[in-house]
């Protein structure tokens, strides 16, 4: 069956996968390339799986122009695993065992809290009353003795995105790119470590890609579990323990799809078009739809908004979500910590998908506006 599905999935992750990728997975599920077995059954030590993992790594390197002095590794544990792995691997780079954190939303806050288990954490700006903007980097209080500076490129819950790489005065920069990885080009050479869970823009849940500069390997704290130690995993070619084989395979297929559709630059162009369609409706709704994020820091990936007023009319929001569901549009409910509505526009979400939502939003506005 290759007929398009009726459901439009705006899920925040796990998220929509390209239809052609799903068909490829379906085609190869029982018999991978004539081997008579599924990737689900394949030994991670086999030459056939080595081809899969090498292909996925090579595509990451090609699509992001990853310099040769960086390792690309595939790990388990998701973004939360990396909240621990980053300090365990890097906070010991300097004797003071401290790190700078930029906290612009729920995920960077969670990362900073986890890092406190392993050293001293310095939040480089005054605590934000609400996560609706990125504090001006020129005001950040960077600690010259910090082992690294950490930030989250896109906050999925609050819809705040960096559209720039912060200048951290030569410090080692670590970035959680889980929710905008390969949605735009990135200069990898500006970072010490980049990590991203695959389940938003580049695949299915279960695998996290980590890009780490060679000179940062080998400084893990003594208590760092081996499965989280970058040097151990890099020297083992991500095979220190049994990796998430099927998720790595799916990621390879999605990366191939991104490559065939113009790469990161084309993804950014599409993301701009898709997000602008929704933001325009919000901004022209005379306060019916309200996005709390400052316009210059709005995310192209995740658009949170309230309906009726800035605090949200919950009855109206429920009606909106129920009606969207009737129209086969799913996973639009805002995160439980903020409420409201959230539209996630990852790479596989098409312009046609967004047009369908935009049309519904306009109709809903006309029906309920005074």
From Swiss-Prot:
One GO term (biological process): L-serine biosynthetic process
Binding site for pyridoxal 5'-phosphate: 79-80, 107, 156, 176, 199, 241-242
In-chain residues carrying the UniProt-annotated modification N-acetylmethionine: 1
SUPFAM superfamilies cross-referenced by the UniProt entry: PLP-dependent transferases
Positions carrying N6-acetyllysine: 51, 127, 269, 318, 323, 333
Presence of keyword Aminoacyl-tRNA synthetase: no
Pathway: Amino-acid biosynthesis; L-serine biosynthesis; L-serine from 3-phospho-D-glycerate: step 2/3
Induction text: By progesterone.
Modified positions (Phosphoserine) in chain numbering: 331
The protein's name: Phosphoserine aminotransferase
Organism (species): Oryctolagus cuniculus
